[in-house]
A protein has these predicted regions:
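A structural signal for multi-pass alpha-helical bundles of membrane permease subunits
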Residues: 31-353, 358-361
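Short, Lys/Arg-rich, polar N-terminal cytosolic tail immediately upstream
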Residues: 2-33
């Protein structure tokens, strides 16, 4: 066979290269990578929150198990910070005080602990009434602001003015209006003791709080209303649905997530009410409008930081319990995961039904 000089060079040029390995990322690997990047981004914020929020909570809980400054009957020396167990909690819940001789008995009249349960009832009363009224008014205001008409932007700006005013300014404003010679009594044509009569004092605080915070509820509900497609309402009108049917069958179900979040925020805020009753009515712990937060401040003013920490811990537990109920049982979806959880439940139910069918077959 004749030798071809270019055959070798051609064969060498046609030599196949060795294939390189290509890394293929699985969905699990991509998911882990995404979670890792997200954790790295939010880690600084979590560290700051742990310092600013976590440490004070832990410190308050530690102080709540330590005794206040008092005279030790066995040594005759003032002691403070000794481990007291549940003494500070029983001081508030059962109104149990320790005498100078070390005997624990019922607190005498005038001790701030005797105002605990009345303050709890007033706090819960304020929270329930104000949140209910603010939710109703907020829904009405949100529906008005969500309409299509001229001057809608001006109406939205005007509605939010009360919420933008500082709470202290709001309290002084309504205090002047509810004064004996104020504009409210002038309009009513009678003399009502708004700041001294227990019933009217509580009514005054409720009116001021609803006036200030209803726009906040309206703003959150409006955000939910704007997420509802207009096509849904148009289809309902074509089908002959009345305005009430559109509200109950379309608006309320679709706006429920935003509504429950708004109720959650307002309830937690109402349970910590302090400045309105203090500025408008009185800062005394036996005031007809005294809240639990007022007792904390009053106890701290008397130098009882450990028992005040115990009361703060009780407030924290109350707020945590309310938040858990609203999130777990009433559908307040803060993390936006309710839809995913429902989808997982449906998948589990479908898989279980399929397994049952296979077993039956």
């Amino acid at each position: 066979m004749p030798h071809c000089p270019g055959a070798r060079s051609a064969s060498s040029s046609l030599k196949l290269e060795r294939p390189t390995a290509v890394a293929i990322s699985t969905p699990q690997a991509l998911k882990r990578k995404t979670y890792g990047q997200a954790a790295g981004l939010i880690a600084p914020a979590l560290i700051v929150l742990a310092i600013v929020i976590g440490y004070p909570i832990v410190r308050a809980i530690m102080l709540s198990f330590q005794g206040n400054r008092r005279l030790d009957p066995s040594t005759g020396v003032f002691v403070e910070g000794q481990f007291a167990g549940l003494e500070n909690y029983l001081y508030w819940i059962n109104n149990r005080c320790m005498s100078g001789t070390g005997v624990v008995s019922a607190c005498p009249p005038g001790v701030i602990a005797t105002d605990f349960w009345p303050a709890v009832r007033i706090t819960i009363f304020f929270a329930v009434v104000t949140v209910l009224l603010e939710t109703i008014l907020g829904m009405i205001m949100a529906l008005i602001m969500n309409g299509e008409y001229k001057g809608r932007g001006l109406v939205r700006a005007a509605v939010l003015v009360p919420w933008a005013i500082p709470t202290a300014v709001t309290a002084k404003l309504w205090q002047f209006m509810f004064a004996p010679q104020g504009i409210v009594n002038s309009l009513l044509g009678t003399h009502v003791a708004w700041t001294t009569d227990p019933f009217y004092a509580r009514l005054a605080v409720i009116i001021a709080d609803v006036w200030k915070t209803a726009p906040f509820m309206a703003l959150l509900i409006l955000a939910g209303l704007q997420m509802i497609p207009r096509d849904v309402y148009e289809a309902a009108r074509v089908d002959g649905a009345t305005a009430w049917q559109r509200f109950t069958k379309i608006t309320l179900p679709l706006v429920k997530p935003a509504l429950m979040v708004a109720i959650l925020f307002r309830t937690l805020d109402a349970l910590r009410m302090y400045d309105l009753p203090v500025i408008m009515i009185s800062s005394s712990s036996n005031s007809p409008t005294a809240t639990v937060s007022q007792l904390v401040v009053e106890d701290m003013r008397q130098g009882n930081f450990n028992s005040a920490s115990a009361l703060s811990t009780l407030i924290f537990l109350l707020i945590f319990a309310v938040a858990f109920i609203l999130i777990r049982f009433l559908g307040a979806d803060l993390g936006g995961t309710a839809e995913k959880r429902a989808q997982r439940r449906q998948e589990k139910a479908a898989k279980k039904a399929q397994n049952n069918q296979e077993v039956a077959a």
